[in-house]
Amino acid sequence: MTNSIFFFFICGETLPPDNIHAVSVSMPTLQDIIDYEEQTPEILEKITIAYPRFVMHPYLKILAKFIKEKYKINDNYEVVLLSSQKAVKAVSNKYFIHNKIDINEPFGVILVQNGTTQLNKVLKFIQHVGYNLSSRLAQEYLFKEGLIDTKHIEGYEDEKTAYNTLTKTLAIAYNQPQKNVCLTPSGMNAVYCAL
């Protein structure tokens, strides 16, 4: 195939490449996908960033550790970071979590006892409803606290240029007039944003 728009990316490379906030990751071979589904240690070493519902972002790991130390939280509890206080209320009410310490942060935090089925249920619930704290908000917090040295700066295309490029490409791919292409948000919007 000549003039292909597809390139080979090594397993674990973020898509878009070199973007700490990427929501997709390269798994170029069928074996990579099988290893990921089976959660082999080798693949988990390679894939440190992926779709946030499936892989905890490195910034969230750093932030959870910081919150645990800042509030002197017992090791019997897992710090679970959420997108908002509204998310805290929803998760707390559903799973009867009523933290005994006051945590005052610009995002949601709950403490769930380690080694319990409740922790797994809470994490699954958060995964499916999308209550995860964003890596960009975590980055801002970590930078302000001096826990990371730099912030990843993302380049953005002009909105009209991006829209025209996408609709034109889709129109050609589907052999349709560009006016027939309509972009709408969906669960897969992260994939087309990555490409």
List the predicted regions and their residue ranges.
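Conserved N-terminal alpha-helix of the aminotransferase class I/II PLP-enzyme fold
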Residues: 1-189
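Buried hydrophobic packing segments
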Residues: 190-195
